[in-house]
């Protein structure tokens, strides 16, 4: 009887233990399945020393909150209207981090290890092969028609060109929408091939294709070289009333002035007339000086008309070859899009961001550091000061000398410099904005895995940010050089005129040899 009671008690205890164990097991399975159903992204840590550890829930939650806050800040500050963006990517998508599960089997199932090379991809691939849940998954790329690839915007050629003159006798032009468009697909190409570790051969191929694109583009640009060189010659006339750097001042004369005055003024007397007008700047209303001033004013006006005509002619030439330029842009687009469409992941739910990281390290990081090492705002301040001081000096000289061809020349150069400054200011704002945005987005994009669809959006987004940043950085540097090339020549003219006034007010007879001595003993600003 006692033995039967003991047996009955043990049976009851066993049944209770079985029920409790079953409930615990079902609860664990339910928890795991809930995590599986909601999982979109798992973070991968960025330090080699911590690769055997996994961050706990609090750390990840804190990181999520910081990431979301950074995204809000970026969205609020990105006001650039430089080139219309065709990417409708919402950077908040795909950033739903979950706590890492506590079950080792769950972690092993998805091979979430802190590796950033092909070893990680191999682990993912092997796990997927051994996983019944993923045997029927289609690993082909998603439908690329859903992505809004960048197109050439509707633009007016005349309003979309920066004309650059980085040094005297040289002139170049940049069609800004083309530059940004080509750069966008260049970075899309590199981001795509860098997604895999073994990219050396592909990288060489991309470099070669981009070099070919650039050469073809320059070849089309060269079709306007004759018009461009003609414009350079006219600019030289405008900026050099006569060549003050030439020891033989008689060697530079206005042939155009003979046409204006119906050859009434002999060429051999022109230098003497300029000297006389310098001596008599306070007597501009005398009959002889009035005639000379009228001649100079008409000469300058005709040169300005010539300048505007030739500039329009250059723009027309560029527009005439617009189809050739557009074809080159489409070739670059097709090439970059093709590489992008070949991008694949071993596991579509866990695509790593090696490509974004490697491309950033290789091409962008050095540029970011270079920009941050410069004080772009100080550059703007210095240029503003130059423009203000030169305008003040111009006003004073104008009062002293009245109508004088050098004054018109200074006004022309000064107007050009103000336009160049406005362009530099414009590009500087874009550079500052994009530097901050790129750095913030890189923090969110690297050392992580994404679902494939989200990774592709991010590659498009980063390529867009890079192209805007690099276009403005390149153009700002060329415009900067152009500004100081003009400023150097402006200084030369100012020095000459100040010297003239000093001689005049000291009652020293003005002869050309004095100016030669001045140039020899006091080198003009370099």
Swiss-Prot record:
Single Gene Ontology BP annotation: symbiont entry into host cell
Subcellular location: Secreted; Cytoplasmic vesicle, Secretory vesicle, Rhoptry lumen; Host cell membrane
Sites annotated Cleavage: 140-141
Protein task: Essential for the invasion of host erythrocytes by blood stage merozoites. By binding P113 at the surface of the merozoite and human BSG/basigin on the erythrocyte membrane, leads to the establishment of a tight junction between the merozoite and host erythrocyte membranes. In addition, the interaction with BSG results in BSG dimerization which triggers an increase in intracellular Ca(2+) in the erythrocyte. This essential step leads to a rearrangement of the erythrocyte cytoskeleton required for the merozoite invasion.
Post-translational modification (record): Cleaved into a 45kDa form during merozoite invasion of host erythrocyte.
Compositional bias per record (Acidic residues), positions renumbered to this chain: 259-279
Region of interest (Mediates interaction with human BSG), residue spans: 33-51
Native source species: Plasmodium falciparum (isolate 3D7)
Application notes: Potential candidate for the development of parasite blood stage vaccines. In vitro and in vivo, induces neutralizing antibodies capable of inhibiting merozoite invasion of host erythrocytes.
Keyword tags: Cytoplasmic vesicle, Disulfide bond, Glycoprotein, Host cell membrane, Host membrane, Membrane, Secreted, Signal
Residues listed as glycosylation sites in the UniProt record: 38, 214, 297
Disulfide pairings: 224-317, 345-351
Complex and partners: Forms a complex composed of RH5, P113 and human BSG/basigin; the complex bridges the merozoite and host erythrocyte membranes. Within the complex, interacts (via C-terminus) with human BSG/basigin isoform 2 (via the extracellular domain); the interaction is independent of BSG glycosylation status. Weakly interacts with P.troglodytes BSG but not with G.gorilla BSG. Also, interacts (via N-terminus) with P113; the interaction tethers RH5 to the merozoite membrane.
Signal peptide limits: 1-24
The name this protein goes by in its record: Reticulocyte-binding protein homolog 5
A GO-annotated cellular component: host cell plasma membrane
């Amino acid at each position: 009887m006692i033995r039967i009671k003991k047996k009955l008690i043990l049976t009851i205890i066993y049944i209770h233990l079985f029920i409790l164990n079953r409930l615990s097991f079902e609860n664990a399975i339910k928890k795991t399945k809930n995590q599986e159903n909601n999982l979109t992204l798992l973070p991968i840590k960025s330090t080699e020393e911590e690769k055997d550890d996994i961050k706990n829930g609090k750390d990840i939650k804190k990181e999520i909150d910081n990431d979301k806050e950074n995204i809000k800040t970026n969205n609020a500050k990105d006001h650039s209207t430089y080139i219309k963006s065709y990417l409708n990517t919402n950077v908040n998508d795909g950033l739903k981090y979950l706590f890492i599960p506590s079950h080792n089997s769950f972690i092993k199932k998805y091979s979430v290890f802190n590796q950033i090379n092909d070893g990680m991809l191999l682990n993912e691939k092997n796990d997927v092969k051994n996983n019944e849940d993923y045997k029927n998954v289609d690993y082909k790329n998603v439908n690329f028609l859903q992505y809004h690839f960048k197109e050439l915007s509707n633009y007016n050629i005349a309003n979309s060109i920066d004309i650059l003159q980085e040094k005297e006798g040289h002139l170049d032009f940049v069609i800004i929408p083309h530059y940004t468009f080509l750069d966008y697909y260049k970075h899309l190409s590199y981001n795509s091939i860098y997604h895999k570790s073994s990219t050396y051969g592909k990288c060489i191929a991309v470099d070669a294709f981009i070099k070919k694109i650039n050469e073809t583009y320059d070849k089309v640009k060269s079709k306007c070289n004759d018009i461009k060189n003609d414009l350079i010659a006219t600019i030289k006339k405008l900026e050099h009333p006569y060549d003050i750097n030439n020891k033989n001042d008689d060697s530079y004369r206005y042939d155009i002035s003979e046409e204006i005055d119906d050859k009434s003024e002999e060429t051999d007397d022109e230098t003497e007339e300029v000297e006389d007008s310098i001596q008599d700047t306070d007597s501009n209303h005398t009959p002889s000086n009035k005639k000379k001033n009228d001649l100079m004013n008409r000469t300058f006006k005709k040169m300005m008309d010539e300048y505007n005509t030739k500039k329009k002619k250059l723009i027309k030439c560029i527009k005439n070859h617009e189809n050739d330029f557009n074809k080159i842009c489409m070739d670059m687009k097709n090439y970059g899009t093709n590489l992008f469409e070949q991008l694949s992941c071993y596991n579509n739910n866990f695509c790593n961001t090696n490509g974004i990281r490697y491309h950033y390290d290789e091409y962008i990081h050095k540029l970011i550091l270079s920009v941050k090492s410069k004080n772009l705002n100080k550059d703007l301040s210095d240029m503003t000061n130059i423009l203000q001081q030169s305008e003040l000096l111009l006003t004073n000289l104008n009062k002293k000398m009245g109508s004088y061809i050098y004054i018109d020349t200074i006004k022309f150069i000064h107007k050009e410099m103000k336009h160049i400054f406005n362009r530099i200011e414009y590009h500087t704002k874009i550079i500052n904005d994009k530097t901050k945005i790129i750095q913030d987005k890189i923090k969110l994009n690297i050392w992580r895995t994404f679902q494939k669809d989200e990774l592709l959006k991010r590659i498009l987004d980063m390529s867009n940010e890079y192209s805007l940043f690099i276009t403005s950085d390149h153009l700002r540097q060329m415009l900067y050089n152009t500004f100081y090339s003009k400023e150097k020549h402006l200084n030369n003219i100012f020095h000459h005129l100040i010297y003239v006034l000093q001689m005049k007010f000291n009652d020293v007879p003005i002869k050309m040899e004095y100016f030669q001595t001045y140039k020899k003993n006091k080198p003009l600003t370099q």
